């Protein structure tokens, strides 16, 4: 088996490649660069591409995917593409139009995975972050079970092959799983996960329910002032990680990615650097010993780089619970 084709089976029968390419970039990165790097990622062997409506780059990501289909590098069915339902579209009647908007931007007929970006509903409208005159977010009240039913309809309509969630805690997952008349379980929960926040309890819970945990921020996140928790350490400068990188003759980033893969986590690697995009594919070329895995477990400090502090007062703010 080609290790680059390493996949996890989802609870609905579809499969997800365990290494994905994250496409999020700060606003100052020119959009044309997104097209370039997404093409580079596909050329390097990435088959799982992760984006979102709110990244404001689905036109470019779609263009890159289509050009790689047109030049014969891949077929559409070789690519696993994820999009996300933004917080201003959580009302059930807005779910399908939001997905259709993403599909129009992408110029694709379907997405492989559509996930609820956060369990936090914001006031519907054009603004991604609707604020009142005091600069506070304007929340909306939506029953997430009703949102989920609308997601199920998108799957039935063939607009999304699989449906899942992101940034949900255990209680919120259980709310969906215990919903009367549930038709499809979420296939995944995409959350921040790395050696400093290893999510061991949430991971065990997800595994027990046959839900795949997908890790974003696996390399410690881009250090964007607006979102970064204050006094955040730099993950890839961690001495244990760096010592291990020397031992295996790999980069600290590869050690961090491999650690998650060996725990059964699907990992998103985000990079706009050509050399590192290619380098990240080497994660399939080596294995960490169980002793080294234990040492990496010891790095956990429950540090969340992206606490979404601006929504802390929302009744469904997910990070107040232990997990």
From Swiss-Prot:
Detected in endometrium surface epithelium (at protein level). Detected in endometrium. NADP(+) binds at residues 20-24, 50, 166-167, 190, 216-222, 270-280. Its EC number is 1.1.1.-. It is an enzyme of class 1 (oxidoreductase). Pfam families: Aldo_ket_red (PF00248). One of its GO terms (biological process) is daunorubicin metabolic process. PROSITE patterns: ALDOKETO_REDUCTASE_1 (PS00798), ALDOKETO_REDUCTASE_2 (PS00062), ALDOKETO_REDUCTASE_3 (PS00063). The record marks 84 as: Lowers pKa of active site Tyr. The active site is at 55 (proton donor). Substrate binds at residues 31, 117. InterPro entries: AKR, AKR1C, Aldo/ket_reductase_CS, NADP_OxRdtase_dom, NADP_OxRdtase_dom_sf. The keyword Disulfide bond does not apply. One of its GO terms (molecular function) is androsterone dehydrogenase [NAD(P)+] activity. SUPFAM superfamilies: NAD(P)-linked oxidoreductase (SSF51430). It is found in: Cytoplasm. Keywords: Cytoplasm, Lipid metabolism, NADP, Oxidoreductase, Steroid metabolism. GO terms for cellular component: cytosol. Monomer. Belongs to the aldo/keto reductase family. NADP-dependent oxidoreductase involved in steroid metabolism. May act on various hydroxysteroids. This is Aldo-keto reductase family 1 member C23-like protein. It comes from Equus caballus (Horse). The lineage of its organism: Eukaryota, Metazoa, Chordata, Craniata, Vertebrata.
């Amino acid at each position: 088996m080609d290790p680059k084709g390493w996949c996890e089976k989802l609870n609905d029968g579809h499969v997800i490649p365990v290494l994905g390419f994250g496409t999020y970039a700060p606003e100052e990165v020119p959009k044309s660069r997104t097209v370039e790097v997404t093409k580079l990622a596909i050329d390097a062997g990435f088959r799982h591409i992760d984006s979102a409506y709110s990244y404001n780059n689905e036109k470019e990501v779609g263009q890159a995917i289509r050009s790689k289909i047109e030049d014969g590098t891949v077929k559409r069915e070789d690519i696993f593409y994820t999009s996300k339902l933004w917080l201003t579209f959580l009302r059930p009647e807005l779910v399908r139009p939001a997905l259709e908007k993403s599909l129009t931007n992408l110029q694709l007929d379907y997405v492989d995975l559509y996930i609820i970006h956060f369990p936090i509903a914001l006031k519907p409208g054009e603004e991604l972050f609707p604020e009142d005159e005091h600069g506070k977010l304007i929340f909306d009240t939506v029953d997430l079970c009703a949102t989920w039913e609308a997601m199920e309809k998108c799957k039935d309509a063939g607009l999304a092959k699989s449906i899942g969630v992101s940034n949900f805690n255990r209680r919120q997952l259980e709310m969906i799983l215990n919903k009367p008349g549930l038709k499809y379980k979420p296939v995944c929960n995409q959350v921040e996960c790395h050696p400093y926040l290893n999510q061991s309890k949430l991971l065990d819970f997800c595994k027990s329910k046959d839900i795949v945990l997908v890790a974003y921020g696996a390399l410690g996140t881009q250090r964007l002032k607006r979102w970064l928790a204050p006094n955040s350490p730099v993950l890839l400068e961690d001495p244990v990680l760096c010592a291990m990188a020397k031992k295996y003759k790999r980069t600290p980033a590869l050690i961090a990615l491999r650690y998650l893969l060996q725990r059964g986590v699907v990992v998103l690697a985000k990079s706009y650097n050509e050399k590192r995009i290619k380098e990240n594919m080497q994660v399939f070329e080596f294995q960490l010993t169980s002793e080294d895995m234990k040492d990496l477990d010891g790095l956990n400090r429950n540090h969340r780089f992206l606490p979404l502090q601006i929504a802390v007062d929302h009744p469904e703010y997910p990070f107040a619970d232990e997990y």
